[in-house]
């Protein structure tokens, strides 16, 4: 060991001496004596490695307390951190999809703080059913006879098929054999549910007679799958649920539909593209309809199945139902969200998803212009900060070809180097509340459709 190396080692402090320093008192109070000591030992090992490798001390050796504080602060951050979503995708799967209404947030908090009547009947002190209250709400909204709630729509489809068609055939149009995120494919789900897929028609055209010819003594269901995350256009043909229900009645085969996103209101009244609604399919005679809780409905992640009482009963009694059931927090949030639909005149104000989707491009443009000046003052030396028109998307496989006119703040490096955009985006991701945009066409875009808290936005970007 050289004299220089020995000198560097001698500069490393003893843990006991560090802990006696007043700057470590608050750290020990906040993070605990054990964790602080554990980290100091780790840092001493790191420092010795640096000395051996480069004959120097790490820069943080000048202020051990500051480095410990920085590391423990970062360590204490939740894995699920709030972010500002300016990607232009309203229902962003990677960012948690639908924001919850205040009523849903309050309902979840209450359910977490207190015992609740999850499966308890106050009338007779007996055991109740956890889906009952929500089933009544869903029946009121959709016109269905009964309802069942599980933890997501993939689970809903799995349960629906396993409980009603295991060991039998399910007839589906080839053009509806969808794949959604995470390689969730309808054929794979059918296989897991114990069903045999009988695909009919072609990718772009399927006729009623294709279904008719496929039905045999082993057919359990005729199934429709709403292609909510892609669109086939041009020379196409598909039969709707009403026509398929009529055929099913003739052949004595029930019809079920995986609706995917599942809007409970006619979106066209808000100037948005129309999506099929569960209540329309129930009115058409579909036996079971499944859809998501956290997409266009604007609630928590959940799989909802509405339909005929006898078929829902088969789902409720299936062993998979217990494995897939929703917990009390999900049910509390979903109930509070569904109650908002009982007052449709206030829905676009109280339901965040609908509120964000219905923001006009003009309002967003004015917001962008209002925010431009302070950002130019802060970033103008390195970037051209402009207000640009853009198109938002709904996201989560909803209305894939439809875009919503919006406005964005864009950042273009004066030197034209793309690495500066990557660096800026990375800096914003490291903020206490990360700001998430997207890089496209030589610019960093911040689509403001989902920006409601301007003050927090400016506090982050002007740091």
Curated annotation (Swiss-Prot):
Gene3D superfamilies noted in UniProt: 3.90.1150.180, Type I PLP-dependent aspartate aminotransferase-like (Major domain) (3.40.640.10)
Subunit structure: Homodecamer; pentamer of dimers. Binds only one seryl-tRNA(Sec) per dimer.
Domain of life: Bacteria
Its job: Converts seryl-tRNA(Sec) to selenocysteinyl-tRNA(Sec) required for selenoprotein biosynthesis.
The protein's name in its UniProt record: L-seryl-tRNA(Sec) selenium transferase
Gene that this polypeptide is encoded by: selA
MF terms (GO), sorted A to Z: L-seryl-tRNA(Sec) selenium transferase activity
Cofactor(s) it depends on: pyridoxal 5'-phosphate
SUPFAM superfamilies: PLP-dependent transferases
UniProt pathway annotation: Aminoacyl-tRNA biosynthesis; selenocysteinyl-tRNA(Sec) biosynthesis; selenocysteinyl-tRNA(Sec) from L-seryl-tRNA(Sec) (bacterial route): step 1/1
Keywords, ordered alphabetically: Cytoplasm, Protein biosynthesis, Pyridoxal phosphate, Selenium, Transferase
Chain positions found as N6-(pyridoxal phosphate)lysine: 295
EC numbers, comma separated: 2.9.1.1
Example GO biological process: selenocysteine incorporation
Record field: catalytic activity: L-seryl-tRNA(Sec) + selenophosphate + H(+) = L-selenocysteinyl-tRNA(Sec) + phosphate
Main location: cytoplasm
Pfam families membership: Se-cys_synth_N (PF12390), SelA (PF03841)
Keyword Transit peptide: no
Subcellular location, record wording: Cytoplasm
Entry's family note: Belongs to the SelA family.
HAMAP family: SelA
A cellular component annotation (GO) from this entry: cytoplasm
